[in-house]
Amino acid sequence: MLLILRLFTLVASPADLGPDESQYWFWSRDLAFGYFSKPPMIAWTIGATTALFGNSEWAVRLAAPLLHIGAAVFLYLTAKQLFTQRIAFWAGVAWLTIPGVTLSSFLITTDALLLFFWSGALFFLLRIIQAPSPKLLDFAALGAAIGFGLLSKYAMIYFPIAMVLAMVMAPPVRRTVLRPELLLTASIAVGLLIPNILWNVANDFQTVAHTAANANWGASLFKPGNLLTFIVEQFAIAGPVFFGVFLWVGYRQWRGFSKVTSDKTTINALIPFALTPLVIVCVQAFISRAHANWAVAAYPAIIMLAVAWLHEHRAAWVAKATVGAHAALTLAFVLALSHFSTVDRLGLASAIKEIRGWEEQSHAVAAMAAGYDAVMIDDRALMGAMLYYERGTPLEIVAIDPNASISHHYEAFKAFDPDKHKRVLFVTTRSDDNHVNYRFKQITPLGPTTVSLGGDQMRTYHLFDVAEFFGKRQR
């Protein structure tokens, strides 16, 4: 029922594609082994769903709720191995209703892919740990899950790190997992990643460099306020009850990890898969910054541990009540995404501004583009929106680099070409011509184009007629 509700909402929602989503869609038009800011799996996935169902917004996003259902199935199967069928059922349901997954089910992001493959890898690893005689197929499947996870988001690298920690801290896990068959796991994972590595080599390590730049270690460092913000955000992603219970469980179990008995080894083995992403990203948040979703890989283990602890301590009703509260929140999301007017009346228009107004804004700019060789844009968000919403037109849409360095995919692969684009309609977030006045001799302001995003939220771009390029050519 939850899947049907989410699919219906995707189809019925007036939400436009957001900046990242439209960029991923653009990537899917030209399938490759890598892209500027992400590995290729997101583009391959969108390419598959749009090939089957067309290019509507819901078709672009279709994989998101399906992937989370798949992750829930893996969590159910994993929890069933470790605990009871009842705990497994509630772990799967809890997963589908936590706020972070609810939001992620309505948008196409790399997180949905990462969580699916992470949950699959966790399932196959626990099968290996628990089996008296592990099967070669499970080692192969583990390698495939890790490899495909790395092709989805490089944060999958936390998984092998957590594996090593589990083997170091729990000798029974080490004896079960550290076998010759593990070479097959590593070979498959690395083999799947090699095409992406080669793509990075051929393209100046763009994805790797972008990922490193996101860490922002070149700015002022050591920001405890950012760490506190990140921790508070984790309570919002999993819900305060489940995340709070996990912190208590993690504290208790981690203290006694070395004394764990053999029948509890597999349960304790989950903890590194929760703490590894959390601790690494907490350090990153303290040093510089971290987005709320950067530790999202921790949550499959977090939810299983929290639900199991509540059931085993006669507090199953707390888990069920929390799921009920999260389900109510899901219904609120459905209402908000189906009826933007409700959001506006509540004064929350700013919360959804990233998925509103792009189609209208794109068409407004396109209406001004007659007679120009191209529309030239200095903003990644509008660039993606116009490529998506003007896809059925012959309009040429190109990016111009405003800061003498390649900042996103369009600047690298959809750049302004002065040999082809003699007279262009320049669209900018700035009200002045500072991004072009040292490159073009002829510049005529044409005024702004503004769209309403609900409430008092507005989005404005400024248009200029520019020609006679004389500046430095982009790479």
Identify the residue ranges that each predicted region occupies.
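Short helix- or helix-capping micro-motifs
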Residues: 2, 91-99, 146, 150
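Hydrophobic/aromatic-rich transmembrane helices and adjacent perimembrane loops
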Residues: 31, 104, 237-240, 244, ...
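Transmembrane-helix motifs of polytopic, lipid-linked glycan transferases
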Residues: 62-83, 120, 124
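Transmembrane-helix signature of polytopic, membrane-embedded enzymes
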Residues: 75-97, 116
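Membrane-interface transmembrane helices that cradle and orient dolichyl/undecaprenyl
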Residues: 80-86, 121-138
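Short acidic/glycine- and proline-prone juxtamembrane loop motifs at membrane-interface regions
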Residues: 100-114
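Transmembrane-lumen/periplasm boundary regions of multi-pass, lipid-linked membrane glycan transferases
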Residues: 148, 160-267, 273-277, 282-285
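Membrane-proximal, lumen/periplasm-facing interface regions of secretory-pathway glyco-
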Residues: 292, 316-371, 380-410, 426-474
